[in-house]
Amino acid sequence: MKTLNTFFLIMFAVCFLSSKSYASTACAATSTAASHQGLSGSANYATNGDDGYCFHTPTSMKVTVYEFGLCTAASSPTSKTACTTIFNNTSGKTLDLGVGSSLPLSDSVSLTEGTYTHAYVVLSNVTSIKSVIQFSTARVDDTNNSGTYCYTDGRSVNDTPKPKSVMSCGSNGSNAAYAVETIGLGGNTYSNTYINYTVSMGGVNIVSNLYAITSSGALSSAGNDFALYGSQQLASAVNITPDTKGLDIAFSITDGVTLGFGINLGNGVAVGQTGPNDAVFEGLRFKITAR
């Protein structure tokens, strides 16, 4: 066993210029509903089962983390034998990824020397997203306000009745507020498992196995989701050797949200809205290096 000093940084990467987006998948100053249509099923497809979405780096994302670990193979809620848990808190720790906050990890962690290809996280299925995007020309929101800035305004897709939009537009983004979202895996049909969920974040394809679980850690059924268990293949494997002194562990939210244009959130689409009307959590990228 190798005892390491562990540094955990929740990293917010402002990375618009270095994001190697694919054709028509990244949100841009000129984006419209037409810019992100017709991509479904193609290699350049932006996101989550519907046309009309583009990748975006949010201003801030709040998540609650219950557990985090490093693994030598893919894991699941019922099979973590390949993993070493680095953080565990049954009450959870809420992190503001846009500001940069840290998990209270132990001073050291023991890892068996070898190659770690995966990591896992258990996080609440309720997230909060704050996003602001600036366009080159004025856009109109669902209440006929207009401006070159569009932003999440505090409404949620979980509201009753359903809103037509969770975003407003104006002359600046100072009124941006968090949009709360309860994450599901199955779209219109409930599912507690999503294998090989793939999303491009910062130009890197991130592959994860996702599971909806109960508070006891078992796979959930419709209506009793408590958290998400995500097993993610690392973009670069972590090698623990006799010379390894510690670990640097980070989350990146670059391209971690998608914005949608002309999306029916359950109450129709507002006539004349030219700005985005939806903001959706897409994922986190684990960035782990040995030193």
Which residues fall in each region the model found?
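Bacterial N-terminal signal peptides that target proteins for export
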Residues: 1-8
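Bacterial N-terminal signal peptides
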Residues: 8-16
